[in-house]
């Protein structure tokens, strides 16, 4: 989930941009649009491994009729996934001809690979599995298991398609609140968990039987169960054949062919129009940032008036360090709020956004230039003095030199805010150290928005084989729970036929392949729970700042614009089992299951 848009990562390979270790030479990355731009002619320079593009303008108040590509007051757009617009023919190329391995190559099914992509519904009872093999994995005809040297006893498959799915509960908020998976009663969860346990237990006969059954039932064009079965089956196959990174590159290449700025923009806008998944975090974070600035301005003004000798100066500039993956779609609502809620002169807003890229690219720079120009025009329309800068950073976010970003422009008159929307999970290593480095910036407020899932797995060399297998089953089950909820929300929010929905679902497929088949050191799917992030923030010296009633009302008003099933829940009850630390902030819940966490923190 690697989330939809990495602030311009139109390509799937953002999965590898946040890998815990650099990809080997045989796993090249492709960078996507993410450059910088505004209205004035751009100047660029290089510092370390960052590329800067800076644009600014003074306070204009003309009524330009050029609008930013934002719709409505939800604030969102772009969520955690990667976007590309794909036509059915292109999708067949992505998941069809080049990947006909499920039935034809390894499972001796009577079906063709074309049937795998059919949209037929699941049968009311389980299909009859193929006859079990008489010997071990060395038997011919199933080379998939030959290298594993498995021994497998006779196993009867008896699955209850009417019961609850055997998905382990999350150790985070979902578990703490007793939330059940949204896919309760669905057949895919039970079959997939049985298969994951068989893979972890090296029971190759059961794996073969279950994968055959899943292959007969799965379809990327069916209902939620069929789609989940299709994506997780592809991930399991890639894991068993140790072809995860290669499969991921193939899927990314297919999606890249159909990716463009316009298609990604359309997907982002449609996603925020039909789902509060990203607007929820945007509205909550913007409210916390604005209130923090207004409080600082009011306190500074009061101190200045009470003592003529006071050195306290109310801030007149707001500088935001934006570590997010939302194509800057968060900021139009903040610009509008600054223009309408500031009692005195409208403050100057500066945004420095960090764009993670595998390598500097002209395409990335062009896209960010376009985004900057649109933001600039919208700021002029709102009458807000504004400057925008993008920093293209290659490598792990933990390696970013925050001191070199020059965030203190304006000195004492500037208030600094740090915005982390689906960004902290992109830190592959040294997460505690990175959060501590944010504390050293002495910001007025830090906003953290992350998806609620416990997908962090231990490194293979840091655990015993048994622990690694147990961790795989745990992460698999948690991933199944999380992606089931996400897919279910898409199913009920989008029309049946939608290019934007197809794009989001294909991104889910890539995220699942990454999670299931790639080594932990290379996977970009490293989400943690709210309680875990809260523990890190407290350890770094931050204290939670509760959302005000005004912000909570704004969020509730936002949710009322969407279909039933969405709600906001207090995150105070969620705890980290390992440390006993309570979370803070609020959850966006889909059918009572927490899926997105938003919080605000102060030094």
UniProtKB/Swiss-Prot annotation:
A GO molecular-function descriptor: DNA-binding transcription factor activity
Subcellular location: Nucleus
Keywords: Developmental protein, Nucleus, Transcription, Transcription regulation
Keyword Transcription: yes
Region Disordered, residue ranges: 11-58, 106-140
GO biological process, one term: asymmetric cell division
Region Leucine repeat I (LRI): start-end pairs: 186-249
Gene Ontology CC: nucleus
Main location, first listed in the record: nucleus
Keyword Protein biosynthesis attributed: no
Region PFYRE, annotated ranges: 416-514
Span list, region Leucine repeat II (LRII): 370-406
Superkingdom of the organism of origin: Eukaryota
Assigned protein family: Belongs to the GRAS family.
Protein name per its UniProtKB record: Protein SHORT-ROOT 2
């Amino acid at each position: 989930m690697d989330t939809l848009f990495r602030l311009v990562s139109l390509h799937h390979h953002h999965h590898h941009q946040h890998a815990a270790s650099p990809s080997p030479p045989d796993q090249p990355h492709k960078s996507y649009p993410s450059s910088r731009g505004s209205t004035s002619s751009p100047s660029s320079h290089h510092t370390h491994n960052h590329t800067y593009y800076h644009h600014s303008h003074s306070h204009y108040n003309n009524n330009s009729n050029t609008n930013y590509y934002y719709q409505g007051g939800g604030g969102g757009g772009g969520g955690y996934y990667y976007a590309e617009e794909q036509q059915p023919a292109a999708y067949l190329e992505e998941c069809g001809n080049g990947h006909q391995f499920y039935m034809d190559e390894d499972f001796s099914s009577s079906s063709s690979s074309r049937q795998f992509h059919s949209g037929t519904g699941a049968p009311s009872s389980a299909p009859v599995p193929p006859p079990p093999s008489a010997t071990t994995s060395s038997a011919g005809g199933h080379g998939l298991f030959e290298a594993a040297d498995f021994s497998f006893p006779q196993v009867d498959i008896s699955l209850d398609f009417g019961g609850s799915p055997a998905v382990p509960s999350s150790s985070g908020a979902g578990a703490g609140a007793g939330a059940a998976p949204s896919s309760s009663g669905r057949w895919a969860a039970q079959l997939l968990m049985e298969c994951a346990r068989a893979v972890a237990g090296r029971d190759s006969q059961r794996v073969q039987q279950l994968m055959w059954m899943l292959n007969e039932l799965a379809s990327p064009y069916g209902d939620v169960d069929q789609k989940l079965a299709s994506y997780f089956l592809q991930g399991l196959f890639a894991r068993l054949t140790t072809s995860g990174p290669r499969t991921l590159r193939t899927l990314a290449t297919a999606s890249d062919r159909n990716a463009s700025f316009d298609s990604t923009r359309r997907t982002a806008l449609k996603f925020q129009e039909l789902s509060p998944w990203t607007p929820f975090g945007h509205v909550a974070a913007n409210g916390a940032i604005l209130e923090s600035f207004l409080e600082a301005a009011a306190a500074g003004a009061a101190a200045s008036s009470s003592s003529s000798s006071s050195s306290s100066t109310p801030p007149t500039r707001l500088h935001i360090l934006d570590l997010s993956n939302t194509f800057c779609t968060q900021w139009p609502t903040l610009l509008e709020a600054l223009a309408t809620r500031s009692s005195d002169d409208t403050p100057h807003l500066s945004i420095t956004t960090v764009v993670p890229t595998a390598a500097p690219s002209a395409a990335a720079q062009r896209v960010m230039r376009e985004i900057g120009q649109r933001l600039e025009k919208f700021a002029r329309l709102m009458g807000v003095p504004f400057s925008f800068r993008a920093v293209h950073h290659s490598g792990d976010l933990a390696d970013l030199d925050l001191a070199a970003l020059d965030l203190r422009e304006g000195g004492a008159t500037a208030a600094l805010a740090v915005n982390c929307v689906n960004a902290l999970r992109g830190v592959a290593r040294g997460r505690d150290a990175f959060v501590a480095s944010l504390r050293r910036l002495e910001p007025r407020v830090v906003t953290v928005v992350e998806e609620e899932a416990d997908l962090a797995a231990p490194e293979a060399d840091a655990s015993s084989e048994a622990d690694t297998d147990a961790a795989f089953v745990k992460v698999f089950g948690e991933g199944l729970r999380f992606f089931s909820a996400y897919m279910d929300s898409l199913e009920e929010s989008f029309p049946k036929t939608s290019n934007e929905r197809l794009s989001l679902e294909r991104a889910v497929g890539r995220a699942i392949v990454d999670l299931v088949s790639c080594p932990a050191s290379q996977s970009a799917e490293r989400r943690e729970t709210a309680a875990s992030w809260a523990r890190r923030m407290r350890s770094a010296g931050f204290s939670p700042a509760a959302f005000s009633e005004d912000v909570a009302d704004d969020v509730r008003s936002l949710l009322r614009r969407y279909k039933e099933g969405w709600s906001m829940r207090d995150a105070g009850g969620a705890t980290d089992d390992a440390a006993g630390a309570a979370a803070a902030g609020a959850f966006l819940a889909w059918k009572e299951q927490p899926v997105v966490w938003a919080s605000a923190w102060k030094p």
